[in-house]
Amino acid sequence: MHYSSVLPDVIKVADEASEKVLHIYQSDFKVSYKSDDSPITAADTAAHDIITHGLRSISRDIPILSEEGKDIPWEERKHWRRFWLVDPVDGTKDFTQRTGEFTVNIAMIEDGLPVMGV
């Protein structure tokens, strides 16, 4: 994979997710809690959906590991040479407190190392 050839598409996906996150940020959103007591909002799930759909359209054969996705056992993941690592809203606690300190993160991991990040 030539990363420079997909980077503009990944940036577009991140921008689309970011727009949705900011729209929700400006609304009266609700906060729920996951089993580990970490917060989750509609922004997390909406960004996850946008990002996973976008990344699959870019590279259907590359697995996606997202904080808001299904749990994928290590026994399966340990064989992945390359995968997308996604945190749809990194800083959800700050998001819920409206500090402005949050981001959308998308990274390509190859052989255990980050090779591209948006």
Set out the residue ranges of the language-model regions:
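DPxDG-like acidic metal-binding loop motif
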Residues: 77-118
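N-terminal subdomain of lithium-sensitive/metallo-dependent phosphomonoesterases centered on the IMPase/IPPase/PAP
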Residues: 1-89
